[in-house]
Amino acid sequence: MKSFITRNKTAILATVAATGTAIGAYYYYNQLQQQQQRGKKNTINKDEKKDTKDSQKETEGAKKSTAPSNPPIYPVSSNGEPDFSNKANFTAEEKDKYALALKDKGNQFFRNKKYDDAIKYYNWALELKEDPVFYSNLSACYVSVGDLKKVVEMSTKALELKPDYSKVLLRRASANEGLGKFADAMFDLSVLSLNGDFNDASIEPMLERNLNKQAMSKLKEKFGDIDTATATPTELSTQPAKERKDKQENLPSVTSMASFFGIFKPELTFANYDESNEADKELMNGLSNLYKRSPESYDKADESFTKAARLFEEQLDKNNEDEKLKEKLAISLEHTGIFKFLKNDPLGAHEDIKKAIELFPRVNSYIYMALIMADRNDSTEYYNYFDKALKLDSNNSSVYYHRGQMNFILQNYDQAGKDFDKAKELDPENIFPYIQLACLAYRENKFDDCETLFSEAKRKFPEAPEVPNFFAEILTDKNDFDKALKQYDLAIELENKLDGIYVGIAPLVGKATLLTRNPTVENFIEATNLLEKASKLDPRSEQAKIGLAQMKLQQEDIDEAITLFEESADLARTMEEKLQAITFAEAAKVQQRIRSDPVLAKKIQETLAKLREQGLM
């Protein structure tokens, strides 16, 4: 599998608009420099590799010969150590000469693994002359004795004197990684690449490793309910995300909510409604808001279902044999359960829906429980709950539709097609089976059939934005971008004509994403406007935010990009999605730090200017 950096070079930090605006980041500049320097082999030499992996590397200037027999050229006290009592009278030339001799003496001790003595002589050399090599050698000594803090301290002093000291940058990066200061390590590695000292193959694995560690650390810091240090990608993708204790969990985007509940036939009433009962009124209010398709209605429904469940439980405690109360409580718990599931609380969802089934089994309760099982990757239980739902109502189209979805995911295409056909037969006014059948045909490489099925759906549902929106996704996958843009425009137009949310911001995000594939100035501006509009219309959409963050990054609005990436992490459903957003944010922070350094920022502009001159940009 490709590394995160390799996969996301463009998405993270790598695009330059046609105006030539610089989008600064280590990997992008490095990538362009590789084009400039094709064939040039700037790899880490053996000594440098040894320095990062083997503490016994020789310091700079060390000789292979044995210690010289001649007496030292610098003044010596009676104990054999340097005598600086007359240092004030040393000439500049003498200071340089003595310092070099002391450094050479330190090298002899280093070569003989007498690191404490080597450290003393390097420090004495520094008393006479501040030299980056002396600090570098000191840092190498501290590598050998395992004092990583001192490695960083001495490396920093060397870099203050010689900012482009490649060997020391690499050494400090390694030490910072060992100290858990991954962001600092990333910065040094980025500077190394920007300097063009090493090629992409040399630096990228180290940067990738530190970026992963930094992102994992931030993930654990913010959400802390998975062992991120040892988690595999599969564990991250299946681990339900638990928000911070100080932050209330929210519902997903209203676009997602409308899409999810749009599959079900609206249930706007229930048996034995008593308008004098506050619990009944809350349940009725919840059902009414659930199908209003407005931005605020889902939060209102959530609140009402929660209140209704609490009130019905109180009433049932006083009269636990009342079957009517049991049914009403079951309906309430069914809905609090699915809302908890959508808010990333699968355990709470399972508990509520299980209790609802025990009180009064309903088709939707079984469907929701099946979805919880699917979220756990338990396909066996998933199908079992659908079987139970069909025993209650063998003609419920939603059961067949959701079972078809699972078969589609598992690539059981024949069975998926049968389920979608049945759902379509049972509820011909539900648009989603039509769309899924068209998507299924495309998945089976039958584009003509796919197009025919979309045409059928369009004839039956001429005002439905779902048809052009999903067809645009298919056309995008087919690389038919011009037609896809037209379909997205049609979907946006149809959505705007309707009361309520149907496809929501999906066509706005889809069109923006498509525009960025042809990165002209005009397309970037339009894509940014579309994503800003999408984020305002649906503030809980992580897709809109992460897309907008990438645009802000490319426009050098790094602060805003970081904020949006971090907000995306809060909104994302799974740990894997959260990790990706955090990784983007941490990569952007490195870019921010590089560009805030005047020397590095100047170097970035110089590098890009050269590339423009050569026609590489």
UniProtKB/Swiss-Prot annotation:
Organism (species): Saccharomyces cerevisiae (strain ATCC 204508 / S288c)
Protein name per Swiss-Prot or TrEMBL: Mitochondrial import receptor subunit TOM70
Biased amino acid composition, Polar residues: 229-240
Transmembrane segments: 11-30
Family: Belongs to the Tom70 family.
Highest classification ranks of the organism: Eukaryota, Fungi, Dikarya, Ascomycota, Saccharomycotina
Membrane among keywords: yes
Matching InterPro entries: Tom70, TPR-like_helical_dom_sf, TPR_rpt
Biased composition (Basic and acidic residues): 44-63
Phosphoserine PTM sites in chain numbering: S174
Subunit (UniProt): Forms part of the TOM (translocase of outer membrane) complex that consists of at least 7 different proteins (TOM5, TOM6, TOM7, TOM20, TOM22, TOM40 and TOM70). In the complex interacts with TOM22. Interacts with TOM37.
Superkingdom: Eukaryota
Annotated TPR repeat ranges: 99-132, 134-165, 281-315, 363-396, 397-430, 432-464, 465-498, 505-541, 542-575
A GO molecular function held by the record: protein-transporting ATPase activity
